[in-house]
Amino acid sequence: MKFRFKPLIIIVCALLLIGCISSEQEYDHPLYDTSTSALPVQQFDSFLEYQQTVQTWLEQNRVFLQDDHAAELSYNTPFEIMPNQANSVKKGIIFVHGLGDSPWSFVDVAKEFADDGYLVRSVLLPGHGSRPADLVPISISDWENTVKNQVEIMQKEGLEVSLSGFSTGANLVTDYANSDPSIEALYLFSPAFKSDSDIDFLAPAGALFVDWVFQGDPQNHNNLMKYNSVPLNGFAQYYWTSYEVQKSLERKPFDRPAFLAVTQDDSVVNVTEVLKLFETQFTNANSRFIWFGDKPDTLDKRVVHFDSRVPSKRISNFSHMSLLYREDNFYYGANGKFPMCRNSTDPLDYEACLNSDEPWYSAWGYKEEGKVHARLTYNPYFDEMLDYAKSITAL
């Protein structure tokens, strides 16, 4: 009886969760129907073969959100950037995006590494880039195999390989790198090692019974770079990435250079736990941890602090996604095409943001009396952050 009690509790909680969400409105829309064919996940022999196969599949299966299909395809297709230096290429880096995101997430960071002599490549994790419903049948093994295949391709080309990931992608690359001693270094942005939710472990059980917690009005799916909603199985597979990376780091600390960057006000990740893992399980003296927020409580001299409140730019604090983008990014920058006024579940906040000439910017859900907040979608310290990232290893 002792050993059956906990699984029983989990099942009961999952069923209660399903009961709570069963009243959510469901929409009859292609965004919420899985594609007629799955994204190919076979072992590719070259990056070009992989890139062309993915692009062809996206052309046939993506639910396009605007008339410029070519632009949408370019944002969601794996990309490659050759280094600007004329000398022979010796190092490569692979970028892995987060849950619901796209390869374009690394557009600004990737250019920095290409400028420093790296061959840069990105991947599209299965279930992404096409329609949110394509995350329903996905498993963590699909994502793990994608990372493994691309690493093996780059290694066969004779390059020293580093890995970089954002959020869920950071979990995947850390878990992989910890089992492959040939990986030179890690670059992790908002690593989602530990969720800020205490019930994330329920997602795998819930996903066995229901596909969606919340779909959202299809008209609100207007972000060309990422999904506006994710099925429950997406969160379930994220949970397994966090579980696997925690177990991996418990078994063996990561001993090569690593760069980690987090924001104190992350609405997705338990960043205090991420910092603790860095202090104890990332053992290389050249590693660096960037903390955006109040000065953290740590004695680790590898930790660097930046104040995340920047009144001159109407920034109250940093969001989970903001670390990746330059201030002049055409889509998410200070004057970008896609301001994120949907920064909480309160429709009044959304309307107030739309009608504000000078909103402030913050993490999801942040409120302050007398201020209207949109999501912060860029990093005013982007260059300083990348300088620290580049410092952990030299070409």
Identify the function of each model-found stretch.
Residues 165-169, 173:
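Gly/Ala-rich beta-loop-alpha elbow adjacent to hydrolase catalytic centers
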Residues 18-19:
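C-terminal motif of bacterial Sec signal peptides marking the signal peptidase cleavage site
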Residues 175-185:
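Conserved hydrolase catalytic core segment
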